[in-house]
A protein has these predicted regions:
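N-terminal accessory scaffold of Fe(II)-dependent oxygenases
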Residues: 1-10, 15-251, 259-355
């Protein structure tokens, strides 16, 4: 980390949110209510105080130094270094593309032990300067990188997924979506999530699908300073936006495919999230394949395939489309199962390998 230049102060903590519309809130829930009420509603919701009992939250509410020392204590031998994104001061915490070609990013990556990362963040936090480099460790799985974290900070919502840590200073993460169900828990610092429903996709001006910063594609629009001349439809997206302001101990449930911009305020910020039901990621792969196989067909032919997609995929009764066949003959049109998933995978492999 010695190559990172001297630090600076965050000048952006007083910036106003993009909208006054707030995400719905409720108090902390137990596992039963989470499964039956929160997950099934398919709407974002703030769970106030959901993880206020965590040891890590107590450290985060204490001071930057207390938080840094708590994190460093998990840097035992055997813990893997973290993948850290490092951006120069002039990007003001916004990880994005470097220029109009969209071929390069405005940051680089470095493998850093947890102890070295928090020491650098603490040095930044305790130094009064103008504007810092931005450091951001993203999606570090606790079992691999911070062994012992999950035992000390249990979520208790019946989620079968590892805790993932996001550690940095004042960051701005471009509007993106996740293919999995997501619950994000703030440990230290303050987080602002700006969310857009899935149907706002056309108004978000999505960037490249196959050259992205961290997996999913991102909106090209900066919600903190939108260029409405270049991206006029984003004004419509803002009328549907919702904002969640989170303090340490709060959690936010985000349904899959909901777009969200994430902003962290402060000198040392820690968030823990959980993704599960990862199979939904296959839907994006199917979309990409459809772009190549269907999108550019002649209009009449494409309309014919639209009928197939509607009948077998999107119609309310699509799961019953093969009910006229005996169960033994339904094959990949049969009900969801591990066996069907394997058969579909093998069918696709066989088809894609043909000359």
């Amino acid at each position: 980390m010695s190559s990172v230049p001297p630090p600076a102060t965050d000048r952006s903590a007083t910036d106003r949110p993009a909208t006054d519309c707030r995400v719905a809130e409720r108090p902390a829930v137990d596992a039963a209510a989470f499964a039956s009420e929160v997950v099934t509603a398919f709407q974002p919701v703030v769970l106030r105080g959901q993880v206020r009992h965590w040891q890590a939250v107590a450290a985060g509410r204490g001071s930057d130094r207390a938080m840094a020392e708590y994190l460093a204590a998990f840097g035992a031998p055997g813990g893997k270094p973290l993948d850290v994104m490092i951006a120069p001061p002039e990007v003001e915490g916004r990880f994005f593309y470097a220029d109009e070609t969209l071929t390069r990013f405005n940051f680089h990556r470095q493998q850093v032990p947890i102890g070295a990362l928090v020491a650098e963040l603490l040095r930044y936090a305790e130094t009064d300067a103008a504007l810092p480099h931005t450091l951001y460790a993203n999606a570090a799985t606790a079992p691999e990188h911070l062994p012992g974290w999950e035992g000390a900070n249990p979520l208790d919502l019946g989620i079968d997924a590892p805790a993932r840590l996001w550690i940095g200073n004042a960051t701005r993460i471009a509007t993106h979506y996740d293919t999995s169900i997501n619950i994000a828990c703030v440990v230290a610092g303050r987080r602002r999530f700006t969310l857009f429903p899935p149907d706002q996709l056309p108004n978000l001006y999505v960037g490249p699908l196959d050259h992205t910063m961290a997996g999913p594609p991102s909106s090209m629009v900066d919600p903190d300073a939108p260029d409405l001349t270049r991206y006029p439809r984003f004004a419509d997206a803002l009328t549907h936006a919702q904002v969640a302001e989170l303090e340490p101990g709060d959690a936010l449930f985000i349904p899959p495919t909901w777009w969200h911009h994430v902003r962290a305020f402060g000198r040392l910020n820690v968030l823990v999230n959980y993704w599960w039901e990862h199979r939904s990621g296959a839907a994006f792969l199917a979309l990409v394949h459809a772009i190549g196989a269907v999108r550019d067909l002649p209009a009449a032919e494409k309309q014919a395939w639209h009928s197939w997609y509607e009948h077998l995929v999107f119609a309310p009764d699509a799961a019953q489309a093969a009910d006229h066949l005996p169960p033994s003959a339904r094959g990949i049109l049969g009900p969801d199962s591990t066996d069907r998933t394997g058969r579909i995978r093998q069918f696709l492999i066989n088809m894609l390998q043909r000359p």
